[in-house]
Amino acid sequence: MTHSLRVIFAGTPEFAAAALAAIHEAGFPVPLVLTQPDRPAGRGMKLQASAVKRYALERGMAVAQPPSLRRAGKYPAEAVAALDLLHATPHDVMVVAAYGLLLPQEVLELPRHGCINIHASLLPRWRGAAPIHRAIEAGDAETGVTLMQMDAGLDTGAMLHEARVAIAPDDTTATLHDKLAAAGARLIVDALVELERTGALAATPQPADGVTYAEKIGKHEAALDWRKPAAALARQVRAFDPFPGGAGTLDGATLKLWAADAVPGRDDAAPGTIVDIGPDGVVIACGEGALRVTQLQKPGGKRLPAREFLAGAPLAVGQRFAPADAA
């Protein structure tokens, strides 16, 4: 089936690529794709194209990669060229998903139907850069995807559609990301079909109550604070997979802790102390309960199940991970 509604798409990572693929496969014309400039990545730090760029080029779509869209910003010449391209490209709506650049008011007002954002949370909870990580870290039972009519604020626009997704006890940011990407892809296609058919989408202002912000994840957050309850640390480990990973410092070496669950602890063990080692994992005392770590990684090594890790890097009961503020 083909559609007449013309969609400019702006997005960068895999989450966005899933939406672009769904829009394209549904038959909506995509005359232009905006994505972030290629970035150094991997061990060789070679320039790599975004997931959105790779998908678009493989299907012959026009791609632009401006470093900014602000005329008065750091890259005025590139911004002006991109804005001229947007003005010259006939379109009806812009769909934005994890793009990574601020859209000035000029861009928000350009499409006939405005700009629709695909946001990976149930707004107004978890506005901001890291909604998937923060939902897991906070212990939320569910999250979802919200389609929002973009305005000048940070994820403050009126809500158009939402889809709810349960957070499983073993979900990591990686697994939940994939569930939400699929949900967002379905949601945006349904919305575009409705927009084409009816000419408008019903919009509901976000409630003033329940607003929270999902701050960007920093590498410094990886260090586990063993004084916290084990349940909170288990959520942190899941929230920080694949980035930045949970981390603990033992005898001067930083170990990555990739999978863990909370188990009963011992009252006589100081937080950070290894209290048990077995084929099922390494058990570490916490402020409340204990954390059983089942997947570890030593510096320069690979992620390994505890049994394989211990075969090459023996640990001992009584060893103690350094406090987070001393790591």
From Swiss-Prot:
(6S)-5,6,7,8-tetrahydrofolate binds at S121, L122, L123, P124. GO terms for cellular component: cytosol. It is an enzyme of class 2 (transferase). Pfam families: Formyl_trans_C, Formyl_trans_N. It catalyses: L-methionyl-tRNA(fMet) + (6R)-10-formyltetrahydrofolate = N-formyl-L-methionyl-tRNA(fMet) + (6S)-5,6,7,8-tetrahydrofolate + H(+). GO terms for molecular function: methionyl-tRNA formyltransferase activity. Its EC number is 2.1.2.9. Coiled coil: none annotated. Keywords: Protein biosynthesis, Transferase. InterPro entries: Fmt (IPR005794), Formyl_trans_C (IPR005793), Formyl_trans_C_sf (IPR037022), Formyl_transf_N (IPR002376), Formyl_transf_N_sf (IPR036477), Formyl_transferase-like_C_sf (IPR011034), GART_AS (IPR001555), Met-tRNA-FMT_C (IPR044135). Attaches a formyl group to the free amino group of methionyl-tRNA(fMet). The formyl group appears to play a dual role in the initiator identity of N-formylmethionyl-tRNA by promoting its recognition by IF2 and preventing the misappropriation of this tRNA by the elongation apparatus. NCBIfam families: fmt. Belongs to the Fmt family. This is Methionyl-tRNA formyltransferase. It comes from Burkholderia pseudomallei (strain K96243).
